[in-house]
């Protein structure tokens, strides 16, 4: 659905080998990303693997609340989905679901591009609803891009970036 009154682009180019592709309702390939208990602990604070119904509920909710994209990398002249990111002014969760692509700077490039999108949309600030206290990689990702903790949450902190 995208952000009210704003047309969501089909693609957002991150660089020559990475792009965001607008959510199209097809996500069967993403199911395996939401089965890894360590990943889920960082993402949800729970180790319970997703069911297809829960995955559908998550993507449906995010698609109604904001913009949803699949993160794709160009490999042998074909784009491959390796994760997802959702974007709205008050939250921006990202998952590099394919572990082979973690720790390669992809999440940093994606969040940096979505910060630019926020500026283009006229936002004065962006927020991250909650990063768990044990999710040090996400804390580092967002703070390195200028986000600052501003509010304590049940299991961590909310972060804000003034644009």
Regions found by a protein language model. Name each.
Residues 124, 129, 148:
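Short acidic/polar active-site loop segments enriched in Thr and Asp
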Residues 58-71:
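A short helix-loop-beta-strand connector motif used in the catalytic cores of GNAT acetyltransferases and
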């Amino acid at each position: 659905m995208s952000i009210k009154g704003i047309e969501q682009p089909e693609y957002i180019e991150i660089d020559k080998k990475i792009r965001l592709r607008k959510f199209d309702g097809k996500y069967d390939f993403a199911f395996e990303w939401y089965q890894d208990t360590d990943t889920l602990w960082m993402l949800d604070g729970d180790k319970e693997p997703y069911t297809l119904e829960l995955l559908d509920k998550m993507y449906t909710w995010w698609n109604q609340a904001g913009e949803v994209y699949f993160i794709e990398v160009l490999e042998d002249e074909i784009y491959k989905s390796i994760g997802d990111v959702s974007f709205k002014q008050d939250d921006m969760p990202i998952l590099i679901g394919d572990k082979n692509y973690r720790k390669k700077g992809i999440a940093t490039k994606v969040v940096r591009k979505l910060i630019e999108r926020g500026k283009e949309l006229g936002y004065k600030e962006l927020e991250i609803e909650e990063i768990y206290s044990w999710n040090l990689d996400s804390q580092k990702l967002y703070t390195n891009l200028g986000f600052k903790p501003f509010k304590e949450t049940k299991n961590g902190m909310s972060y804000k970036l003034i644009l």
